[in-house]
Amino acid sequence: MIRRRWGTLGFAVLLLAIAAWFIPTPYFVLRPGTAVPVLQLVNVAGGDLREKGQFLLTTVSVSEASALQYLFAWMIPGSSLVPREKLLEPGESSDAYRLRQREWMLLSQQNAIIAAFRYAGRPVEEFLLGVKVLRTLSGMPAEGVLASGDRIVALDGHPIRTVPQLLRVLEGKREGESVRISLWRKGRKLEKRLSLVRFSRSEGGHVGIGIVPVTERRIQTDPQVRIQADHIGGPSAGLMFALEILNQLTSEDLTRGLKIAGTGTLSAEGEVGQIGGVEQKVMAADREGADLFFVPADVHPGDSNQFKAEAVAREIGSRMKIVPVHSLEEAVGYLKRLKEERAKVSNIDTPANLAYNNPVLVARAGAL
């Protein structure tokens, strides 16, 4: 009888655990991801592929937390729970979030190419093609009229090439005013009419049509660059992409025989910006045996990448050198000063402070 009772209890616990695995929660769980050699992802035509060391791109594993994962996340080192609204835009689905992350990844690649080629003094051209619609907002004028992937090229006859251009044209409009939008959809040019609405003060208070926009552009370089990172999303690989591109463009091996990991958004001007999940990325790099880790420097109130990276490196007893940087130029300068030997320094190494513009704190697309 006792054995049967224990068997029934065990079966009930098993069923409860299985059910808990499928019960959703309003949280995402973040875990240390991978530290991937950037050489596997980047190819500069005719570039110098000889590297005695490696540049490593670090990632964070992000998944929707079930009830069971929620319970165990607190016990697993490196795991953290993030409320759904911290990652997703209002009304944004998980699929739309992944699409946004892919767009930010593309932007990071393009910025990395531009910044690296400009630093090396090599030819690079940027062609601005218009404003792509990532998605339409529920209950707004664009819903059911515009579609994800549409490319807006004019508004009331004004050429539109970038998101700031679209915003400037809209600033001269009034709530309720009807506007004519010229766009491309699957190879066909279309004209649509929409009425403008005013966003709430918390959303900027401007008038708009209810889309999440991104500037669409094409980059042309000589030599050509191919980046294949379809399985990775987000904007934070910009710095490491640029370092690898630069390493292949020039004859000097910037790796210095070291495993060099890092993270950071990168503007086309070469400015490094803040990112998310830095603790998990430091742990992923340490697990891969990296010698040093480039991290966005903390400059403005609210910046925390440098502080968190240094703290987690101490906490896990990492021998990696944490190197905060403000720009691609500063990161390259740091590497050029290194000798070709294993890093032998403590966790923290702060280069000279350089001025730079405000970094991108969080990759969240504004609505128009």
Roles of regions detected by a PLM:
Residues 7-24:
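Hydrophobic membrane-insertion alpha-helices, especially the h-region
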Residues 34-49, 55-64, 84-137, 199-221, ...:
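PDZ/PDZ-like peptide-tail recognition elements
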Residues 117, 142, 149-152, 181, ...:
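Terminal peptide-recognition signature
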Residues 120, 167-211, 313-330, 334-337, ...:
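PDZ-domain C-terminal substructure recognizer with occasional recognition of PDZ-binding tails
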Residues 142-165, 281-282, 289-298:
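Conserved PDZ fold ligand-binding element
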Residues 248, 269-300:
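Glycine- and Gly-Pro-enriched alpha-helical subdomains that act as flexible
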Residues 253-276:
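Catalytic-site beta-strand/loop segments enriched in glycine and acidic/polar residues
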